[in-house]
Each structure stands twice: as structure tokens, then as C-alpha cells.
From Swiss-Prot:
One of its GO terms (cellular component) is virion component. Late protein which may play a role in the virion morphogenesis and have therefore an indirect role on viral transcription ability. Induction: Expressed in the late phase of the viral replicative cycle. Belongs to the chordopoxvirinae E6 family. The keyword Phosphoprotein does not apply. The keyword S-adenosyl-L-methionine does not apply. Pfam families: Pox_E6 (PF04656). Keywords: Late protein, Virion. Its main location: virion. This is Protein E6 homolog. It is found in: Virion.
Length: 571
């Protein structure tokens, strides 16, 4: 397995043959199933130096051969010793119980693993591990551990992991114009998007092909790119849409609004824009005209008629917005100041009287408390926090977001530390409390049927190491993690009952040793051994008969009895 190669990498680089010779001798002398993988690696890598006479004289070496079932290893061993096949056979006959004792250990340990729900869960994830490097825990380097024990206090965790982002102040009007233009172009595609949509506009426009831009899109294109005759679609696709020198100032962003605008600009540069950006601007901007315009963009309804909707009745709001979109988005209604009141009368006339209440006020939907905004100005935040605001929720709520400041512990630098922390708890505790999106959550409260949630919680590298170590405890080597690992464990138990694998492989590769093998099996004259090799002897009955005919050391009854055992009709 790969983790064994990395374990011995420093000695491999130094070509430390003495180390590997001693390492193999130690692992053979103190053999256990957990040594199978390491022994196999050392033999494959340094067989010319490490396969000494002492190794071939040790019973445990042949127990290893019985468990490994690896053709490449068999070839190496067979080339290293001309009589290893007979040595294996003799060791099996003399120390049969030693072989069976380790088989019993395999069965016990495999049954324990198959009863372990945690192990079964990780094996289901194994297809995701194929190209992953497995690593062990390094809790001494993880800030979420103290004296190799996980810290459980979230405030302490926050203090250790939080890193404030340095936002650069941007030119407010330039960013707002760019935001409106990009959002309007996105709406021109005619597609529907979630308020927190994170798809980049480049990909969307590549799929749609050229789109016809609305008047608003082209108007704001003129604001952002004066004297540029290219249509918004081709301008966005082919030209650079941002200019850091004009947008960024030399000052740090101080207020929450300045920080959010800086983040929005960085996202627009990556072609990402959504409705939540408009909502946040509406909440934080103090200009009434900008707030009004953002509201129109959010709902896609002229501002003059928005005042009839009130946030206190979600059913009404939903009814009216759908009603207006279905009946009056026709390029005729509310397009002329002279006809405005006539159009408004027609709209009102079609509204269900039970739904109508002129006192309704949509602006209070996103109205924010100045005190709350000031608290945000004073709060240290990072890009993770603003990202949560823009992408992790359908409805932007500053009060709710204030309580989610702990989510800021997530960033590229802390992601692995959190995953290592969660993985450690999962592998060592039942239903632990883990860190999920900046909050402490009971593991049982999360949907672990979702791979995206599982791998946002846990480290693939650590889970793979856990799986590798459990399989190594059985002496199992997995080359393809997409295979059915549970099936391999179960079939491994039955395969170990077949003691002829190495003998069959050796005789297939070298027919000249067949006579010697047959002779050795018969001469031991042990019923149990003859039964173990019954199929092998049946397949090579010619050599059996030849030997029995020529030997003078067996009586007529001995020969008859041996043939009866081979043919399965003895009493």
C-alpha cells in the first residue's frame, strides 16, 4: 500500500539496506497480520539483499506467503530460492497449527470489523479514495488540540482559527454600476436563478450564446464603458470588465458596507453576481434613490407600485409579484408617464379585492436597524463571513448573520485543521459534537448520506488512512478502492482455507518440481495434509501413481489407503 511506501521513504532515498534487512528480520520474527503489508513492500523492493537464509528458515515467512497471495511476490521468492516450494510444504506439514492460528485471528478480526458501523461507513466511501494520499493525524500541530486532546469550547476554537480579512475600499458608484450591469445581463438570458446562485456568468453566457440586451443593460454599459460600441454580451465575453486602478482606493475598508462592496467587486471580477448582492446593497446603502432602484431590480417591478406590498404578509407579496409578472410584463404597461394612472387602475382592477390593501409597504422588507449596522461596522469579519451572506442563504437577514460570526473560522488555512478535528472525533467517539459551518453540531443531526456534507466535515486523506490501517490489520492489500472491500474481506476468509495456492502457482511455473512436491506430500503420510492437497493430487494423479509404483518405502496397503484418501472413498 502507498502509505507503507511513504513510511519507509526516508530509508529508501538513503538506500539503507541494513535497515531494511533488520526490519524484515524483526517483522518476520515477531510476525502478525499487521506486518504482512510491510513485509511485502520490503521483499518487493530489496529482495536481493533481505531474503537471507535465516528468513527462509523461519516458519513465519511461509505463513506470510500463505496470506499474501500476490503473484509478483511469489515470482520474487521462487527466483530467490530453488527449493522454497518444498520448504513451504515442509513448514506447513510440521507447523500446520501455526498457520491455522493466524487464520483464526483473521476470522476474529474480520468479524469485529464487519460488526463495526464506523468501519462499514468508511468502506462505502472508498471509491472516493482511489487517487487520495492517505495520511495519519498530526494533532500536535493542530490548533484545535491541546496535549493531543480535542478542544470542545467553541469560543476557544474561534479565537484560535479566526483570521480577519483585509478588505480594500472600492469606489462605491463604480462597483454599483458594474453590479447592476452584470446582474441585468444575467437576467437578459431569460433563465431563472436562486437568489444565492453562484454560477459564473461566463459559463452561463457560453451556454446561451448571444443574448439580446435590455435597455437597462445597455444603459448601464454606457455608464461603465463609455464610448464602447460592443454589445454587452460580447463585451463581457471578450474584454476585461474591471479596472482595479480605477475601482480600488489606497484606503482600507472600515464599515461593513465598504467591506461588502469590496467583496462583491472581487466576485464580479470572477463573473459571479446574484440577487443577494442587491439585497445587501439595499440594506446597507444610505442613498434612498439607490435603495429604491435595488428594490426594483430585486422584484422586477416598477418602484411606483411596490408600495402596495407589505412584508407582514408573505402570501400577499407572493400573490402580487406573480400576478404582476403574469399579467403586465408586456412592454406596454407602465411604459409611459402619461398612462401611468390608467395602467395602475387596470392593475388594481384585476387584483382580488380580498388581497388588496393600499397601506402595504414593501420597503420595510429589507429595512435595517442603524444600530445593528453599526454593530457590524465594529465587528471583525473576513471573506468567509461575507461569502455566507451572499451564497449560503436564500434570504439575507443581518440579525441572523450576526449570530453566525463563528462561521468565519472557515478559510483555506483552517479547513484541514477543522476536518482533522472532526475526523478525529468521529473515529474516536460515538455521535460526537463536530464543527459544521462554524457551529457545533451533533453528528447525528447531519445528513451523512450526502457525500458533499461528509467531505465538508471529514478529511478524505485521514479516512483513507483509517481504512488502510484496518485492512492492514488483516494483512489485506487493496489496489483498487472502487472494488467491493467488504466482499474482499469475506472471500479472504474462505481463500485462506486453501493451503495449496503457493504450491499450485510454483508448480505451474516450474513443472520440473511436480514430482518432488507429490513425493513430499505422500511421504509425510498425514491424512490431514493429503486431504488439504487432495484436489492438487487428483489433478496430478499421473505423478502420484508413478511415485507409488516406484517407491519401496510404502506397503501395498499404504498405497491403497493413500489413493482412497485422494479419491475420497476411504473409511
Amino acid at each position: 500500500m502507498d502509505f507503507i511506501r511513504r513510511k519507509y521513504l526516508i530509508y529508501t532515498v538513503e538506500n539503507n539496506i541494513n535497515f531494511f534487512t533488520q526490519e524484515l528480520a524483526d517483522k518476520i520474527s515477531n510476525f502478525c497480520l499487521n506486518h504482512v503489508v510491510a513485509i511485502n513492500y520490503i521483499i518487493k523492493k530489496y529482495h536481493k539483499s533481505v531474503l537471507t537464509k535465516d528468513i527462509f528458515n523461519n516458519t513465519n515467512f511461509y505463513i506470510f506467503l500463505h496470506f499474501i497471495r500476490d503473484c509478483e511476490t511469489y515470482d520474487i521468492v521462487l527466483k530467490s530460492s530453488f527449493d522454497v516450494t518444498l520448504l513451504y510444504l515442509n513448514q506447513l506439514v510440521k507447523n500446520y497449527t501455526s498457520f491455522t492460528d493466524f487464520i483464526d485471528i483473521y476470522k476474529q478480526q474480520s468479524n469485529t470489523l464487519l460488526d463495526d458501523k464506523r468501519f462499514l461507513f468508511v468502506t462505502k466511501l472508498s471509491p472516493y479514495f482511489q487517487d487520495i494520499i492517505s495520511v495519519n493525524f498530526s494533532t500536535e500541530l493542530n490548533p484545535l488540540f491541546h496535549l493531543n486532546e480535542p478542544i470542545k469550547d467553541l469560543e476557544i476554537i474561534y479565537s484560535k482559527l479566526f483570521k480577519e480579512t483585509r478588505f480594500i475600499k472600492v469606489d462605491r458608484i463604480s462597483v454599483l454600476r458594474l453590479l447592476i450591469w452584470a446582474y441585468s445581463l444575467k437576467m437578459d438570458t431569460g433563465m431563472k436563478f436562486d437568489d444565492n446562485d453562484s454560477h459564473d456568468l461566463y459559463t452561463i453566457l457560453q451556454k446561451t450564446g448571444p443574448v439580446v440586451s435590455s435597455i437597462m443593460t445597455e444603459t448601464f454599459k454606457e455608464f461603465v464603458f463609455p464610448k464602447n460600441s460592443t454589445t454587452s454580451y460580447w463585451l463581457f465575453m471578450k474584454e476585461r470588465i474591471y479596472n482595479d486602478e480605477k475601482v480600488y482606493t489606497n484606503e482600507p475598508a472600515i464599515t461593513i458596507y465598504e467591506k461588502v462592496l469590496s467583496y462583491i467587486y472581487s466576485e464580479i471580477k470572477q463573473a459571479r453576481v446574484n440577487k443577494n448582492m442587491l439585497k445587501v446593497v439595499y440594506m446597507l446603502d444610505s442613498d434612498s434613490e439607490i435603495k429604491k432602484f435595488m428594490l426594483e431590480l430585486i422584484y422586477g417591478i416598477p418602484g411606483d407600485i411596490l408600495s402596495i406590498i407589505d412584508e407582514r404578509d408573505e402570501t400577499w407579496k407572493s400573490y402580487f409579484v406573480d400576478f404582476y409578472h403574469d399579467n403586465f410584463i408586456d412592454d406596454k404597461t407602465f411604459t409611459s408617464a402619461n398612462r401611468f394612472y390608467d395602467d395602475l387602475f387596470n392593475v388594481i382592477a384585476k387584483i382580488d379585492p380580498e388581497k388588496f390593501d393600499i397601506r402595504r409597504d414593501i420597503e420595510s422588507i429589507f429595512r435595517t436597524d442603524a444600530t445593528l449596522v453599526k454593530r457590524f461596522d465594529d465587528m471583525k469579519i473576513n471573506s468567509t463571513y461575507v461569502s455566507q451572506m451572499i451564497y449560503q442563504t436564500q434570504n439575507v437577514d443581518l440579525l441572523a448573520l450576526e449570530n453566525k460570526k463563528l462561521c468565519q473560522i472557515y478559510n483555506k488555512d483552517t479547513e484541514y485543521a477543522i476536518k482533522e478535528y472532526n475526523t478525529y472525533l468521529y473515529l474516536n467517539e460515538d455521535n460526537p459534537i463536530v464543527i459544521y459551518k462554524g457551529e457545533l453540531k451533533k453528528l447525528s443531526d447531519l445528513d451523512l448520506n450526502s457525500p458533499s456534507i461528509v467531505f465538508s466535515l471529514f478529511s478524505k486523506s485521514l479516512l483513507k488512512y483509517y481504512l488502510d490501517s484496518k485492512l492492514a490489520s488483516l494483512g489485506l492489500i487493496i489496489e483498487n478502492y472502487k472494488d467491493d472491500i467488504i466482499l474482499k474481506i469475506i472471500t479472504g476468509s474462505s481463500c485462506l482455507q486453501n493451503f495449496t495456492s503457493f504450491i499450485v502457482y510454483a508448480t505451474c511455473n516450474d513443472k520440473s518440481i511436480l514430482k518432488s512436491v507429490v513425493r513430499t506430500i505422500i511421504n509425510h503420510f498425514k491424512v490431514a495434509i493429503i486431504i488439504l492437497f487432495k484436489q492438487f493430487l487428483q489433478e496430478n494423479i499421473y505423478y502420484v501413481n508413478e511415485y507409488l509404483d516406484n517407491t519401496k518405502h510404502l506397503s501395498k496397503n499404504d498405497k491403497k489407503f493413500i489413493l482412497q484418501i485422494i479419491n475420497g472413498n476411504y473409511d
